[in-house]
Amino acid sequence: MAHTLYIVATPIGNIEDITFRAVRILKEVSLVLAEDTRHSRILFDAYNIATPMEAYHDFNKEKVTPKYVEFLKNEGDIALISDAGTPGVADPAFNLVRECVRQSIDVRAIPGPCAMITALISSGMPTDHFTFQYFSPKKSAQRIHLLEKLKHE
C-alpha cells in the first residue's frame, strides 16, 4: 500500500506561524522535501525536528520526482515544504503532487500561512472575487498588456 504525501505550509515571516499539526507531521514522516534545505534547517532547529531532509526544487524536480514517487509507494510518508507559505503556489510542488495524483497516491494538504491570502485580506480590497497572477512580466509594455487583460476578470 502506498504511503501519503503531505503538503505542509510553513511560516512566511514569523517562525511562530506554524500549526501544531504541521510540526507533528514534519516529525512523523519518513522524509521531508524542501526547496532550500539550508533555509528549512532554521525551522527544523527551532522545533527540534530531526526528520531527514532532501532538496526538491526547480532545478532537480524532473530528475527526482520518480524517485520520490517510488519512495511513497514502497518506503514511507513524505512531507513537502516550500521556503515560505503553502507549497504548490508558484513553486515546484505541483510536479510531485500531479504525479502522485496520477498514480493514486494519497495527497493531503496541511493548511497554514499563504502569502497570497495574507496580502489579499490585509489589502482592503473585496475578497469575494480575485485573480492571482504569479510574477508580472519585466517589460513595461507586457505588464500593461497583462493588466489590461486582467482588469476585466
Residue locations for each model-derived region?
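Beta-strand/loop-alpha-helix module characteristic of Rossmann-like adenine-cofactor folds
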Residues: A2-H3, T118-E153
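Short glycine-cluster motifs
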Residues: K73-Q133
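Amphipathic coiled-coil/heptad-repeat helices and related helical stalk/stem segments
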Residues: I18-T19, V64-T65, A93, Q142-R143
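Catalytic-core regions built around general acid/base machinery
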Residues: A22-E28, K67, F71, L96-Q103, ...
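Glycine-rich, flexible N-terminal cofactor/catalytic loop recognition
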Residues: M1-F59
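Conserved helicase motor
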Residues: A55-K63, F135-S140
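Glycine-rich loop at the start of a catalytic domain that most often binds anionic cofactors/ligands
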Residues: D45-A50, L72, A93-F94
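Short phosphate-binding loop-to-helix
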Residues: D58-K73, P92
